[in-house]
Amino acid sequence: MHELLLFASVPAHQHHELLQQLAGLTAMQPQHRLERRLVFKAYRKPGLVNVRVGASQDLQGAELQRLNKMLNGGMFYTQVVGPVSEADFGAPASPVADQDAHMSGTDEKSSVRPHYYDYENQPWKLEFRDIPEAATRSAVTTRLMASASLPKGDVTVPMNAWGYNFVTEYAVEGDIFIHNDIVIFLHRVLHYPTESQEPRRQLPALNEMTPLDRSGGYVLQAAITVQDGSNQETMKIASQHLFGLREQLKSAVRLEQADRLSLDTRAK
């Protein structure tokens, strides 16, 4: 698959107004999204990866084929993405089974059971993004992409077995809109208050997270996914749709092609 994109910087003071404008344009309410994004780096040369390890036995054949193609294609940084909720931030880690059993015997009239973050049941998917194509005539960012589901819980064991080491993680917070075949994501990157050598089993409070852009700005990303990137007519139509959105939003933001090297995912 291929992904075609345009990007725009959005100052903090313009965020609320742009949300309203996008809601009107797409005739839908924003779908709020929070994601954990784990960054892994390949340390093993392609052709040496065996994806049939550990919990990956639970994956379906089609998912395994996608994983094989992604992980054997070259040495890249890749992301493992998992959806989370606002309630997960600052929540205690999920108690073990015997603690749950003990709690179940307490007075039913007591307050509502607290929310726990259950890392062992955290869903994940692997997202591969190639470096954008060079010297494209179209004024959009175009890159090869793929994604596949991963086992829930601790993904470091299968990722290490596949030749990938954990590097760091961050969070993304934003709102999704759908406009015809375009996915519009108005978002910002959030850093954790401290670094970690492995994925966190417990998340800090959301107000402890710090924006990557200290000015409070956001990024507007408009993306179209094309199944057959070799079909030039389909790619041309997708580009035209992005140009149409750019024209509709030109009074508010400047959607443009990203710098190719800023999206370079190759592991050096």
Curated annotation (Swiss-Prot):
Keywords: Activator, Nucleus, Transcription, Transcription regulation. Its main location: nucleus. It is found in: Nucleus. The keyword Transcription regulation applies. Residues 91-112 are annotated as: Disordered. GO terms for molecular function: transcription coregulator activity. The keyword Oxidoreductase does not apply. InterPro entries: Mediator_Med18. One of its GO terms (biological process) is positive regulation of transcription initiation by RNA polymerase II. Residues 99-112 have a biased composition (Basic and acidic residues). GO terms for cellular component: core mediator complex; mediator complex. Component of the Mediator complex, a coactivator involved in the regulated transcription of nearly all RNA polymerase II-dependent genes. Mediator functions as a bridge to convey information from gene-specific regulatory proteins to the basal RNA polymerase II transcription machinery. Mediator is recruited to promoters by direct interactions with regulatory proteins and serves as a scaffold for the assembly of a functional preinitiation complex with RNA polymerase II and the general transcription factors. Component of the Mediator complex. Belongs to the Mediator complex subunit 18 family. This is Mediator of RNA polymerase II transcription subunit 18. The gene is srb5.
